[in-house]
Amino acid sequence: MQLVIAEKTSVARNIAKVLHATNVKDGYLEGKEYLVSWCIGHLIELASADQYRDDWKAWKYETLPMIPENWKYQIKESTKGQFRVLKELLHRADITEVICATDAGREGELIFRLVYNQAECKLPFKRLWISSMEEKAILEGFQQLKDGHEYDDLYYSAVARSEADWLVGINATRLFTVLYHHRLIVGRVQTPTLAMLVEREKSIENFQKEKYYLVHLLMDGLDAVSSRIKEKSAAVQMMEDMKDETAQILSVKKEKKKVQPPKLYDLTTLQREANRLLGFTAQQTLDYTQSLYEKKLVTYPRTDSQYLTDDMEENALLVVGAVNSMFPEMSIKGSEPDIKRLLNSKKVSDHHAIIPTVEITNMDLKALPGGEKEILMLIASKLLCASEQEYIYESIKTEISCHGELFTASGKNVLQYGWKEVEERFFKSYGKNAEKPEEEESDFPDIKIGQVFECVVVKFSEHFTAPPKHYTEDTLLSAMEHAGSSDMIEDAERKGLGTPATRAAIIEKLIEKGFIERKKKQILPTADGRNLIRILPEMIKSPKLTAEWENDLTLISRGQKNVEEFLFEIEKMVTKLVSDNGQPVEEYQKLFSDGRKEIGKCPRCDNKVYVGKRNYYCSGSDCSFTLWKNNRFFESQGKTLDEATVRKLLSEKQVHFKDLVSEKTKRKYEATIKMEVSETGNPKFQLIFPERKKGKKNEE
């Protein structure tokens, strides 16, 4: 009997169906040859600092830097039940081999290995590595299982990543929190990302806009413009001089240009375009695409490649046919797809580009949730565009003379729409929901050198130099992807902050912590975010340094760099960070003056509890007690954690309601919600129902 361990319940069910393991048990599915179970994401995590040494429980400068001699792991409180199931299965007498079927990537590898190690399993294990949840792909994957130890280097890179995040995050967070007496959360990747946002806002604020003017000659469909003019009076004078004058074409430069079809989507380019065109956040796009993957409608989403492998030509042709049949509004009749352009095995590392699967022909697309359908259409349109012909146009630039002044005009005439026709059809299918990129005007008039225009129409227009634009999720993802690239060697394996799989979570975490905020499509740093970056030294907020670390992690996964060497560099940096920042900067202490609103006393340590933007948090530096305003338990009962409720919970440890709403029946009921706080500061809630009256006495 073989035990298959997947990352999520939904994936486990898909695999179990293919393997005919359909007998439902508690925490797993059973068949004649296979047991299939799951992890619910990370079941095991690095132990918190206070699990190593007693003196690490207190947040004090003297305890820094905290560098564990031997790393400890702990089972997550919320997943202990499923870990217990997996441990029992891993030690079941009839299990002879384990198959790792977690997501085929760095974090998926870590999720499985930590469970395997924590359970002290000694069984041999193999690796399932697939890029699609289609039945055919799963069956082929099981026919081509690899020895699990072939992915040891990938596991080592995942361990190095998690330990580096712990070292930087724990030490830097405690250091600056202690120095400035304010909870300041610092992260290896999130802090440099925040620094880029703050730097962009500084550039915008410091930008000095300048006014300038352009004079226009309007002649038979041509709009020729002058060079920039600083003074309005000069522009007006030039306009007056041009009235009733003749203009002559001095030069006409025509150039045939070809624009190659776009590449297929990797996760980052998909997230960027979904944000720009459809307004989705990076996390929404990842969630929608992951759901489509689990429904077998698209291939694996967490990829950094924009190509298919050389052996996928036949399958890709089938998928193009499926897309054309399911989305006729985007297809071009009679077009011959160029599949070979999409193939390049050398540019595919772990997973190929994101494309639809042939399973879309078996799906009622109308039954898909709106967001998923839009993402599927976006992925489908990109496949059609990428396999279409070139977009060819004639670029035209002309110089025109009038009253001794030089004017220019430019435009183009389209010779072949090619892939642009598919793109145009996609935009039309969305109407106002998609932002079509601005394009130069087509149908440039036919002009010749020496041609003269009599009595031209003249006008002038006022303009301002433009500051840098605020980051959107689209442009921030691009900045994260390319951060530090200009300072790195040309053949660096990876450049940037984070990975395609983690960038969305980094953005969401910065929002959750109150360091950045969304305003429509813009992403802006908050006052807390600006202040945090202001006090931090360059070494901890440098995108270049973090990009180098990400490159090192990729080299570790390739077996080209030693884990111990990498972590030694991290430890050196953390040690220097602590030694260089022994005292707070006096002028920065004012940034974190206590203007917060107190709401009660902490039930764990008796320190003040303050009202935050999204939570109620303990002010104690060594206490993690927090109540989130969008608490899931309260929301499931039809309530929110407002200030009145929190005051009651903090003072009495319970609050009584007469109008709770059942999540299942939607009926109102009466109960008391009681709060208990664990030693680690985690609040837990339970419902206490009033005693039912057995009967009513008659009163006389």
Regions found by a protein language model. Give the residues of each.
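Amphipathic alpha-helical transducer elements in NTP-driven molecular machines
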Residues: T9-A16, E33-V36, I40, K76-K87, ...
